[in-house]
Swiss-Prot record:
It comes from Rickettsia conorii (strain ATCC VR-613 / Malish 7). Disulfide bonds: none annotated. InterPro entries: AceGlu_kinase-like_sf, ACT-like_dom_sf, ACT_Aspartokinase, AKii-LysC-BS, Asp/Glu/Uridylate_kinase, Asp_kin_monofn, Asp_kinase, Aspartate_kinase_CS. It catalyses: L-aspartate + ATP = 4-phospho-L-aspartate + ADP. The keyword Transferase applies. It holds the Pfam family ACT_9. GO terms for cellular component: cytosol. This is Aspartokinase. Belongs to the aspartokinase family. SUPFAM superfamilies: ACT-like, Carbamate kinase-like. GO terms for biological process: diaminopimelate biosynthetic process; homoserine biosynthetic process; lysine biosynthetic process via diaminopimelate; threonine biosynthetic process. NCBIfam families: asp_kinases, PRK06635.1-2, PRK06635.1-4, PRK06635.2-2. Keywords: Amino-acid biosynthesis, ATP-binding, Diaminopimelate biosynthesis, Kinase, Lysine biosynthesis, Nucleotide-binding, Transferase.
Length: 401
């Protein structure tokens, strides 16, 4: 008997008909004599609607307001969890919904971007022994003040990975609207190939570079705890997806296996005569704002940072306060930036590879602002209007398959 965590994303639970179609997928695992725990997202579009409603009512500029914001946003997953439990019960399958405070899933106090500190699994273990399927509302936690928190965008992926780790699950299955992970975005490269099996580290680099099938925090967790994960389509449940697992790789190979892009970025330029580069960086990373790249520009007074576009409102308030206090002279935002990332083991050590890439992009009149290297990834910072062209040209140049 294996323990399987199944996570269903927003498009998988977008309406009642789709929720009903999840039931046979869960029953398939039960028929294999496996135990199942389900994690659900809000119905597609619901979280965005709740965000809009909150923004119409509040400026969201203090902790009390963000606490209420989290209560509102967490309601989407609560509705889905209860509806799926009802759908299973209608098929004579014992199931019940669980909310974060009932477990509990304890987090820190960073509302809208909370980090999970601990999960109590006693209730989950109890109901599994009673042959009852726990349906967990993803994306949410509870802090030590008994206030609901949310885990940020992609939080249901994170919930699923955390539950898999806490329960020592045999596998975590992520059900979405695509049939796995592809060598490139099929909307840009129609002949992109599905990857049958991918290493943890490659998947983490893909997720952190803009691939939409898995949130980077979930990728970090499955790699840390070595949890096998599958990415599957809710709409083609019998189709083989992509297995994320530990694989032996030749670190000297220098082969590009996939390419991805990210337009959800914000470039921040700051000038400060009183704050150091590291002081500004430390302020930006408060409240779990994530810096993708940072650079001193000149004279130890001008700094450049690239962060997630979703952090723009938080950072606008922070930097405006610093400017009002005369700790910085000015700041600017640039949203017309994107990254292209090429993923594959050994590529950092292949000098000719980078030379080939830059030569191709120069010939194509594509301006590369910055380059970032890791053992398995080359990331190019370009103008966002060149994204599709760059992906198409590099994909064909290296014949990625």
């Amino acid at each position: 008997m294996a323990l399987i965590i199944q996570k269903f994303g927003g498009t998988s639970v977008a309406n009642i008909d789709r929720i009903k179609k999840i039931v046979p997928i869960i029953k398939t695992e039960i028929a294999k004599n496996n135990q199942v725990i389900v994690v659900v997202s809000a119905m597609a579009g619901v979280t965005n609607q709740l965000v809009t409603l909150c923004n119409e009512l509040s400026s969201l500029n203090n902790i009390s307001q963000f606490a209420e914001y989290d209560v509102a946003l967490s309601s989407g997953e609560i509705v889905t969890a209860s509806l799926l439990a009802l759908a299973l019960q209608e098929e004579d399958i014992k199931a019940r919904s669980f909310l974060a405070w009932q477990l509990p899933m304890l987090t820190d106090n960073n509302h809208s971007k909370a980090l999970v500190e601990s999960i109590t699994t006693d209730l989950l273990e109890k109901y599994l022994q009673l042959n009852t399927i726990p349906i967990i509302a993803g994306f949410q936690g509870i802090n030590k003040s008994n206030r609901l928190t949310t885990l940020g965008r992609g939080g249901s992926d994170t919930t699923a990975a955390l539950i898999a780790a806490a329960m020592k699950a045999d596998r975590c299955d992520i059900y979405t609207d695509v049939e796995g992970i592809f060598t490139a975005d099929p909307r840009i490269i129609p002949n992109a190939k599905k990857i049958k099996e991918i290493d943890f580290l490659e998947m983490l680099e893909l997720a952190s570079s803009g691939a939409q099938v898995l949130h980077p925090r979930a990728g970090e967790l499955v790699m840390r705890y070595k949890i096998d994960m599958r990415v599957l389509s809710t709409f083609s449940p019998d189709t083989e997806g992509t297995l994320i697992t530990s694989k032996d790789k030749n670190m000297e190979n220098g082969i590009i296996n996939s390419i991805t892009s990210n337009k959800n970025l914000l470039k921040i330029s700051v000038k400060s005569m009183s704050l150091s580069f590291l002081q500004v960086a430390n302020m930006i990373t408060q409240n779990n704002n994530h810096i993708e790249f940072m650079q001193e520009i000149k004279n130890n007074e001008e700094y450049s940072f690239i962060t997630n576009l979703t952090d723009k409102n938080n950072l606008q308030a922070l930097l405006t306060n610093l400017k009002d206090d005369k700790q910085i002279q000015y700041f600017t935002f640039d949203t017309e930036i994107a990254t292209i990332s090429l993923i594959g083991y050994g590529i950092k050590n292949d000098c000719k590879l980078l030379e080939t890439i830059l030569s191709k992009l120069t010939n194509d009149n594509i301006n590369v602002h910055m380059i970032q290297l890791s053992e398995v990834k080359i990331t190019l910072f370009i103008n966002d209007q060149d994204t599709e062209k760059t992906i198409f040209n590099l994909y064909n140049l290296f014949k990625i398959s």
